[in-house]
């Protein structure tokens, strides 16, 4: 049991116990003489850790100066006090097994874990009438459950050639187990992109919240009568009710009230991968060595906000200052209506700032992380040169990836678990290459 104290919180002290138990079955009589099995160990562990990552003096309110019209200075509350902050607590249970056979040539490690994070420290968005945009508080509970497998093997080993391989598979499901608000949903505070994410009780971390894009308004749809939720025509056209013209973006009016507003929003995607894997291989043939490492992330969405920004910069028909996008060539026109790209229309309402399914893409990808080729000079040659060792190698990092995502790099969107999967001008992971040699002299 450990006790941690922090002057950053009102409740300074918190206690965090931990315990672990393992049973090495290989040491038991019924397996000790088994030559096929090298290792068989069962593990059980529990641990609790805390988090107090808030800035110093955050429990106190903060004043900021305001310049008055008469030249005097007054002060306002810029940040409210957070006097009741306490430790965020993370409790985790882990069950695992270690297994090895064939004199260590094949090894398996498997783990199941259940992690519960309570009293999460979060900046939560506040309504306008509160006088400040956000409030730091302990709010909600997050649960992460997952499994991890690692298989290591030496498939071929002899005097001249050997191959070692490691394969890792992982699945994690992070959900909001509890959101203590009347509707069990909460908006994160912070920058504009955080408005894309909602913390919804029972839903996964990284859930996108927005509107459902339904294509482009066509001339006949604009002029068609509006049908309300009861299936009745109101006598007005869709164009009149929604304030649109042909060529504008169309969004689904969920409650059929004739308005596109927050009541029509819903879950439109999730940036949390369902599973990921990594495969590392190293080969040695005489004095040559070759290795590569490849990873994959699957079953998640990316919100391509970079693409949305490009479209959103267009005001009416003004495109000055905008780098032309190839998509513009496919925009709606009266003679080109079979498209999902809005037209340069004069009039109507183009809701450019809407987060919607229009910019949600499949983010799954496979990426080659590294490739290395090397050669080690033979011992006799090194002695002739008066050195003990010389290895020359070339290495490439992140040379390519395979994905259907239209942005630059899907891996660059994988940030914080709470706000993952959004490409807001994300800088791609760098491609690098290196040529070098290692020398050890006597």
Question: What is each model feature region?
Answer:
Residues 258, 262, 267-271, 353-363:
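Amphipathic, heptad-repeat alpha-helical segments used for oligomerization and assembly
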Residues 1-201, 355-435:
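Extracellular/periplasmic, surface-exposed regions of secreted and cell-surface proteins
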Residues 1, 69-73, 122-125, 252-258, ...:
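Active-site-adjacent bridging/hinge elements
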Residues 271-302:
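Glycine-rich, aromatic-lined ligand/substrate-binding cores of catalytic
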Residues 433, 440-442:
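Single conserved hydrophobic/aromatic residue that forms the stacking wall/gate
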Residues 123-125, 260-262, 308-310:
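Conserved active-site-proximal loop/helix segments of enzymes involved in bacterial cell-wall
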Residues 137, 154-269, 330-333, 397, ...:
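Conserved small-residue
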Residues 4, 243, 297-391, 396:
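Extracytoplasmic gating/loop element in the C-terminal half of outer-membrane beta-barrel translocons
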């Amino acid at each position: 049991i450990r006790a941690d104290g922090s002057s950053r919180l009102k409740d300074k002290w918190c206690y965090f116990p931990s315990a672990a138990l393992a049973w090495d079955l290989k040491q038991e009589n019924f397996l000790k003489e088994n030559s096929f099995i090298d290792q068989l160990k069962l593990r059980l562990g529990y641990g609790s850790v805390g988090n107090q990552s808030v800035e110093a003096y955050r429990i106190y309110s903060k004043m900021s100066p305001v310049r008055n019209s008469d030249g005097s200075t007054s002060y306002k509350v810029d940040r409210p006090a957070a006097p009741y902050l306490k430790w965020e607590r993370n409790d985790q249970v882990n069950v695992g097994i270690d297994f090895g056979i064939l004199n260590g040539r094949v090894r398996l490690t498997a783990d199941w874990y259940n992690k519960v994070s309570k009293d999460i420290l979060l900046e939560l968005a506040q309504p306008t009438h509160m006088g400040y945009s956000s409030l730091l508080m302990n709010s909600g509970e997050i649960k992460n459950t997952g499994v991890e497998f690692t298989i290591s093997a030496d498939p071929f080993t002899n005097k001249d050639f050997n191959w070692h391989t490691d394969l890792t598979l992982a699945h994690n499901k992070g959900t909001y187990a509890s959101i203590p608000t009347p509707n069990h949903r909460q908006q994160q505070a912070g920058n504009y992109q955080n408005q894309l994410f909602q913390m919804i009780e029972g839903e996964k971390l990284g859930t996108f919240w927005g509107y459902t894009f339904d294509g482009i308004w066509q001339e006949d749809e604009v002029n068609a009568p509006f049908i309300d939720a009861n299936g009745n025509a109101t006598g007005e056209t869709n164009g009149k009710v929604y304030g649109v013209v042909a060529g504008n973006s169309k969004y689904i009016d969920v409650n059929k009230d004739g308005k596109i507003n927050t009541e029509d929003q819903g879950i439109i995607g999730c940036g949390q991968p369902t599973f990921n894997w990594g495969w590392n291989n190293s080969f040695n043939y005489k004095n040559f060595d070759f290795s590569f490492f490849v990873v994959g992330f699957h079953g998640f969405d990316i919100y391509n906000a970079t693409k949305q920004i490009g479209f959103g910069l267009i005001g009416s028909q003004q495109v000055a200052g905008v780098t032309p996008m190839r998509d513009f060539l496919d925009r709606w026109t009266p003679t080109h209506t079979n498209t999902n790209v809005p037209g340069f229309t004069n009039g109507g309402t183009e809701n450019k700032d809407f987060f919607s399914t229009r910019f949600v893409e499949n983010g799954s990808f496979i990426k080659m992380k590294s490739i290395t080729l090397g050669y080690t000079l033979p011992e006799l040659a090194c002695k002739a040169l008066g050195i003990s060792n010389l290895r020359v190698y070339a290495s490439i990092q992140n040379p390519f990836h395979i994905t259907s995502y239209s942005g630059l790099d899907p891996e660059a969107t994988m940030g914080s678990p709470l706000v993952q999967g959004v490409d807001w001008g994300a800088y791609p992971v760098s491609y690098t290459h290196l040529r070098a040699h290692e020398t050890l002299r006597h």
